[in-house]
Amino acid sequence: MNLIIDIGNTTAKVALFNRSEMVEVLTESNQSLDSLEALCSKYRIERGIVATVVDLNERILAELAALPFPLLWLNHETPLPVGNLYETPETLGYDRIAAVVGANEQFPHNDILVIDAGTCITYEFIDSKGQYHGGNISPGMQMRYKALHQFTGRLPLIDSNGRKLPMGRDTETAIRAGVLKGMEYEISGYIEAMKHKYPELLVFLTGGDDFSFDSSVKSAIFADRFLVLKGLNRILNYNNGRI
């Protein structure tokens, strides 16, 4: 059994995999990993992988150090099951490459665009030969709401909970429509441009932000919330024997 620990900017995901099948996944604060003890008692875990985008506090470091099985700490020197053409691998976020690996595992002989809509929106491309070319980074949903509030004098800070109109009828709905429709059109534009260059392109969407697309775009997307976890599990399996 594999233990997958994915520590993000605000939350941590802890998942258990039996080979390539996800058995259980939990989400908790990135300040502690309270579920570890119970999971270790419940399952026979043989190895684990830790991927983090933040500096870990002493409590989490102690919890991880106490685990009775080897851990792989993902970094830019970790061997990957895909080629990496990124010019600065030391600056590449683990979640970006893990999502690509997760998509490639499912369709190893296809050109793939991976879109992760989280704190930022990231666009990653891996070709049909398993070569990761890189990608783009754009502001995420909450970042857009906060920027409109912080960099203007009078626009309020709102969120996506409320009336959603195609065209705003007041300031609140105008901001909400601008953010949500802006994201929709941006993502649709990326897909259209990439499909023009790679006609057989597959598109994966992952991440925590939910938003709608028109039917023609939606039908062309594989939605997979656990793509990063699946990619981390594949990286761990690929490195079995190296830890």
UniProtKB/Swiss-Prot annotation:
Quaternary state and interactors: Homodimer.
GO biological process entries: coenzyme A biosynthetic process
InterPro entries: ATPase_NBD (IPR043129), Type_III_PanK (IPR004619)
UniProt KW keywords: ATP-binding, Coenzyme A biosynthesis, Cytoplasm, Kinase, Metal-binding, Nucleotide-binding, Potassium, Transferase
Pathway(s) this gene product operates in, as recorded in its UniProt entry: Cofactor biosynthesis; coenzyme A biosynthesis; CoA from (R)-pantothenate: step 1/5
Pfam families noted in UniProt: Pan_kinase (PF03309)
This protein's record includes keyword Zinc: no
Protein name, entry field: Type III pantothenate kinase
HAMAP family: Pantothen_kinase_3 (MF_01274)
Binding site for K(+): D116
Binding sites annotated in the UniProt record for ATP: D6, I7, G8, N9, T10, T11, A12, K13, T119
UniProt catalytic activity: (R)-pantothenate + ATP = (R)-4'-phosphopantothenate + ADP + H(+)
Main function: Catalyzes the phosphorylation of pantothenate (Pan), the first step in CoA biosynthesis.
CDD domains: ASKHA_NBD_PanK-III (cd24015)
Its EC number(s): 2.7.1.33
GO molecular function (one): metal ion binding
Keyword Ligase: no
CC cofactor: NH4(+); K(+)
